[in-house]
Amino acid sequence: MRSMKALQKALSRAGSHCGRGGWGHPSRSPLLGGGVRHHLSEAAAQGRETPHSHQPQHQDHDSSESGMLSRLGDLLFYTIAEGQERIPIHKFTTALKATGLQTSDPRLRDCMSEMHRVVQESSSGGLLDRDLFRKCVSSNIVLLTQAFRKKFVIPDFEEFTGHVDRIFEDVKELTGGKVAAYIPQLAKSNPDLWGVSLCTVDGQRHSVGHTKIPFCLQSCVKPLTYAISISTLGTDYVHKFVGKEPSGLRYNKLSLNEEGIPHNPMVNAGAIVVSSLIKMDCNKAEKFDFVLQYLNKMAGNEYMGFSNATFQSEKETGDRNYAIGYYLKEKKCFPKGVDMMAALDLYFQLCSVEVTCESGSVMAATLANGGICPITGESVLSAEAVRNTLSLMHSCGMYDFSGQFAFHVGLPAKSAVSGAILLVVPNVMGMMCLSPPLDKLGNSHRGTSFCQKLVSLFNFHNYDNLRHCARKLDPRREGAEIRNKTVVNLLFAAYSGDVSALRRFALSAMDMEQKDYDSRTALHVAAAEGHIEVVKFLIEACKVNPFAKDRWGNIPLDDAVQFNHLEVVKLLQDYQDSYTLSETQAEAAAEALSKENLESMV
């Protein structure tokens, strides 16, 4: 990611709004074409200038940024246009969705607003030429370039979601389990509801099934409330009042550990105590608003509601929770001055907060992304809070099935009596499943089966060996077959004169200067075949090196001369005269490429 980070740094003063947060992902360094890589290194160097730089240097910097934006915009246009002079807006949005990004993504607001304005004001019928397209995407060019170059955490998102959809359909046929009946409002839930949404740490989204129907978080709010309390109060203070160990008992037991505090924040007693710690100096309304604002930020400001009917139902039928509250009060488990009834009220309110699978998946992705919301880039929770929360979800999140779930699935998760399961794949994605029928342990029957099938197909289990787990798929990597064919595909496109394919490759994970076993580049092949349009694209759009030598010491110009392609000879001679690559730059480029190759091997 060094080159992209350099670009983001260079563009920050130009008003780029597509910042992204997340923990690092190995082997995701873009292999830009020679010219683009050269511009990026210039931008990175100029980004390190001191505040006392002279005005001409700033002008050069602005010019370099403008050229860099223009080049990336052109490459993006060529990739989507596939040889056409204008792009229909619907074609762009379709290609965008294939990467996993949604047109409603907050990070793409500027781009989508500009395209909407173009449609309203232009008579072109929703068609974008190169200049207009570049203007529309310029504010979000970094994010879009990452998306179309497949530099997100899941590169082949369509293939991955195809597998997810097949698992979803398999699990849909399950009919076991019963809807929770001890809370009257929950008893009215439709047992046929079945939905799954996912959101990656890069903001790639996918939903299947009933994913827009609101449901109450219930116990899924427990890890979120705990994370908020750790972020605001710190680990040491919170764990004076609640433990960290699985209880081995039912989640609603009147039981404390040897220290006289609730076993963990995932059982009712622990969740009630954690609720009592939040904003102790505020009234009930202020406490609820405080937590709701946090939850909204975690969900990227997507759907968040409140079911007053469920809240009233909880209060009317919550005798067990009242008993737990009085038990905690008698054992002096609350901080001094805490109103036990106010703590219970807040607990009931938080359990009655509504989300959809879609907004819930963003909350899970915020946990997967170290506390940074992937679709807004806002830092919501501290890294310490996320680490603690995921640890407890892993050991205590699935009621009495927690040990079995940790064994078979090996991922942090939290279930709820509403039929929801919040699942986190750290550093990769978050998921929210909804299916009201519960098994005998109180977990969603379809939800747990889906999680097990997901981990049996993909190497997401905490202890799957990423290097040697040959029987499982790793969606974080491009397929070995694809990587092995990149050189063949590139050179065949150059051989056959397929400029459209080369345009697509320019924004894929492909270096346009890579060589075959004879050290021949695409420019060598195009020059030998006399494909003038291919040569133009490689030297004008990709700025490839015309001095690359094959195993016989020939450069592309030599091949054009040998096969008497006079137009290509003239074009390459003019390009060689204008192409300058100093020894220092060449050494730096070679060192950077060597380092990238080394990192990809580690």
From Swiss-Prot:
Residue span of region Disordered: 1-67
Main localization (coarse): mitochondrion
Binding site for substrate: S219, N268, E314, N321, Y347, Y399, V417
SUPFAM superfamilies tied to this protein: Ankyrin repeat, beta-lactamase/transpeptidase-like
Top-rank taxon: Eukaryota
Induction: Up-regulated by P53 (at protein and mRNA level) under both stressed and non-stressed conditions.
Subunit composition and interactions: Homotetramer, dimer of dimers. Does not assemble into higher oligomers. Interacts with the PDZ domain of the syntrophin SNTA1. Interacts with the PDZ domain of TAX1BP3.
Reported tissue expression: Highly expressed in liver. Expressed in brain and pancreas. Not observed in heart, placenta, lung, skeletal muscle and kidney. Expression is significantly reduced in hepatocellular carcinomas.
Ranges occupied by ANK repeats: 518-547, 552-581
Compartmental location: Mitochondrion
GO biological process, one term: reactive oxygen species metabolic process
Protein's name according to its UniProt entry: Glutaminase liver isoform, mitochondrial
